[in-house]
């Protein structure tokens, strides 16, 4: 068919040229001459003055059509559309290699095709049995990597299209826009996910105006009004009468809001008293929901403002309360005011003891304080301070998770870890550890830190106070 198409055309002159290109096919096979004839402008160019050698070369080209044939005329014809709309894409070894392909993210099912080998009649003529499959027939993770399960080398044949075959790595291209964007950020050697400040990272006008106008909004008289309003709010912290404990209840003096200041010695009780009357307080926390909600908020604020001795006493209060609940076989509710404040208590203790624990734990080869609170392993417990932090971290994790109750296994198998705990051990054991490490450690700075942890009196550190507003 190709020779008959050539014979129907007139020979071309010497200025005509036939060039091969590696672009997409515009016209192939027997349609080449017909498409060229429709786009002909200068018909005088087809005067039969061509030599026999030129006609023979034209017959060879048409008989063995290249990938693309472009015929140049004195006036360029209009580019014809391909006659075969289902033309196959060339194999991996031909054409442009770094062409960007659309990446399908959410339509994975559309890319899942049969892994069977194509039928012989469906295989294109240019794609042999040992050539690479088309890119569009493979998912991205197979085009950019090697598949396991095949002992053949990377240079062996890849005729099979099964998931057990191994594929070569595809050279990944870089987006031009991304490269320019990274160069503008001054970080062209890293990906776009590298943190960096963009050009729009600036303070907006409203925020700058609000900061500048604070001196006109806040005055000394305004500060006095703030404190006066806060005192009025604290005079009636709870509505609906609070916990409304009976006068005969041993917890009545401590359940009032704002009655008097807290005095540890005035509220000292024994372990036997806590076991005997602790259930009554447990039920009041459960029944008086409005008062318990206010108690949770106030206790959380109190836990964050305590000094070291008060914080250690609060740790003993929390662990003693949990031990009483385990002894009475009651659920440890996370909305209990004492248990829910374990998060604030842990944060305050870490803030107060972090400078001391840094040297104390490193000298004994124990994990850091952050690792103790994150991993919460009982195997890391070696002394009273580590026991206190691990147990409080386990309770705080249950509270922060949103669970209704703390599992008994959080306190060891069936809560048996607290069986050896004696109320008051957190305060006594931590003070003992600080003093023992102070005597043992030879570092001068550690001695200062240990002493200041025990007696936090101001010696040095603050240098000025600058306030131009009031």
UniProtKB/Swiss-Prot annotation:
Pfam family, one: Herpes_UL69
InterPro entries: ICP27-like
GO molecular function term, any single one: zinc ion binding
Cited function: Multifunctional regulator of the expression of viral genes that mediates nuclear export of viral intronless mRNAs. This immediate early (EI) protein promotes the nuclear export of viral intronless mRNAs by interacting with mRNAs and host NXF1/TAP.
GO cellular component, one term: host cell cytoplasm
Coiled coil: none
Binding site for Zn(2+): 359, 437, 441, 446
Region (Disordered): 1-31, 73-202
Family indicated by similarity: Belongs to the HHV-1 ICP27 protein family.
Localization per record: Host cytoplasm; Host nucleus
Keywords from the named record: Activator, Early protein, Host cytoplasm, Host nucleus, Host-virus interaction, Metal-binding, RNA-binding, Transcription, Transcription regulation, Zinc, Zinc-finger
Example GO biological process: regulation of DNA-templated transcription
This protein's name: mRNA export factor ICP27 homolog
Biased composition (Basic residues): 94-107, 178-187
Cystine connections: none
């Amino acid at each position: 068919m190709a020779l008959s198409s050539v014979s129907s055309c007139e020979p071309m002159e010497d200025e005509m040229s036939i060039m091969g290109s590696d672009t997409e096919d515009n016209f192939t096979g027997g349609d080449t001459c017909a498409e060229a004839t429709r786009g002909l402008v200068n018909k005088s160019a087809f005067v039969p003055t061509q030599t026999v050698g030129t006609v023979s070369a034209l017959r060879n080209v048409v008989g063995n059509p290249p990938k693309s044939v472009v015929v140049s005329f004195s006036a360029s014809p209009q580019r014809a559309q391909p006659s075969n709309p289902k033309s196959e894409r060339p194999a991996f070894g031909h054409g442009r290699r770094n062409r960007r392909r659309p990446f399908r993210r959410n339509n994975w099912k559309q890319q899942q095709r049969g892994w069977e080998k194509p039928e012989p009649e469906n295989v294109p003529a240019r794609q042999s049995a040992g050539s690479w499959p088309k890119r569009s027939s493979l998912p991205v993770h197979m085009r950019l990597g090697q598949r396991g399960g095949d002992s053949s080398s990377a240079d062996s044949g890849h005729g099979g299209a099964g998931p057990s075959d191994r594929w070569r790595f595809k050279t990944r291209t870089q987006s031009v826009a991304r490269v320019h964007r990274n160069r503008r950020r001054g970080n062209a050697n890293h990906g776009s996910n590298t943190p960096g400040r963009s050009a729009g990272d600036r303070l907006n006008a409203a925020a700058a105006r609000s900061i500048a106008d604070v001196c006109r909004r806040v005055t000394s008289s305004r500060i006095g009004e703030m404190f006066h309003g806060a005192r009025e709010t604290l005079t009636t912290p709870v509505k609906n009468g609070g916990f409304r404990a009976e006068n005969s209840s041993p917890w009545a003096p401590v359940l009032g809001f704002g009655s008097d200041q807290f005095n540890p010695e005035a509220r000292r009780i024994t372990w036997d008293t806590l076991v005997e009357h602790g259930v009554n307080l447990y039920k009041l926390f459960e029944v008086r929901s409005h008062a318990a909600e206010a108690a949770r908020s106030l206790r959380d604020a109190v836990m964050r403002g305590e000094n070291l001795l008060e914080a250690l006493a609060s740790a003993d209060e929390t662990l003693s309360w949990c031990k009483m609940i385990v002894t009475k076989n009651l659920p440890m509710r996370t909305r209990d005011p004492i248990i829910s404040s374990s998060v604030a208590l842990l944060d305050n203790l870490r803030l107060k003891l972090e400078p001391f624990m840094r040297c104390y734990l490193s000298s004994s080869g124990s994990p850091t304080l952050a690792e103790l609170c994150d991993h919460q392993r009982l195997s890391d417990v070696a002394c009273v301070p580590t026991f206190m932090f691990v147990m409080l971290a386990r309770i705080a994790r249950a509270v922060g998770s949103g669970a209704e109750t703390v599992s008994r296994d959080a306190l060891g198998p069936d809560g048996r870890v607290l069986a050896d705990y004696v109320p008051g051990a957190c305060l006594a054991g931590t003070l003992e550890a600080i003093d023992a490490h102070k005597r043992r450690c030879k570092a001068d700075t550690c001695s200062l830190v240990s002493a200041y942890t025990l007696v936090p009196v101001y010696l040095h550190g603050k240098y000025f106070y600058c306030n131009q507003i009031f």
